[in-house]
Structures are given as structure tokens and as C-alpha cells.
């Protein structure tokens, strides 16, 4: 602990607050600009599959990163090590990627245009947060640049 209040945000605390606000908005927003009709069941099924895939990706990231590395903050903990195995051999930020996939799934489940907009906003936000986090990781771990060139940032094989 440095004695600096959390609200000064020197470790990226405000990034976590913003992420929480977007996730809460996505979870609690009413379904607006909905598309219904005979295909609604298909959209909900696809949404359910994406939610399950996103939760699986994020959960795998949480388990494999280990307790010493786990933090919601962009700044890595003092005891952190660079994990490059398991899911981290394919994607650098599987927890963010999982949130993105689950958010899209939730929007499809809700069949709501507002939820699609919020999922897109969360995607852009997590992409920016990952970039901010990577500046700390590159400064901390000399091998991070090589790791960055051989792995995707958020979604395996895609982004």
C-alpha cells in the first residue's frame, strides 16, 4: 500500500469503476429497440451459447492466472508473474475477452438494440483498458513484447 487514496487512480482504479458501471448498465438496462418475432428463440439460443462461451473463457482465465496475479486493476500486483501458458498462450486478456463474448450473448438473449450498444461500448472500453494495462505489463516484464507479438489481445484467433 502506498498511502495514496484509491480515488486518485494511480493504479487504474477509475478503469475498474467505469467497467463496473458499464457491466451494471448492461445487466440492468431495460430491453429497448427489441426485435421479436419467430426468430426470437434462435437469437436467444445463440445468446445463451455466447454467454456460456464467455463465462468459460473468463473463468478459465481467472483459474489459470492464479491468485498472486489476479486483480481487476490495470496495474499488476507486486507479486505478479507473466503467465504465458494455458489459455494465456492464445490470448493475453481472456477475462476481458470472456466479458465481451458474454455481453454480446446477453444482448442477443435480450434481443435489444440498447443492449447491443452497451455491449459495443463495453467492448471498446475493455479494448482501451487492455491497452492501458499492457503499458504497465511491458514496463514490468521484458519478455512481454515478444509475448504480445505471438498472441491475440482479447479473443483467441480473432482479436
Language-model features: locations:
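Membrane-anchoring alpha-helices and their flanking helix-loop junctions
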Residues: 1-85, 97-159
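Conserved SAM-binding loop
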Residues: 91-92
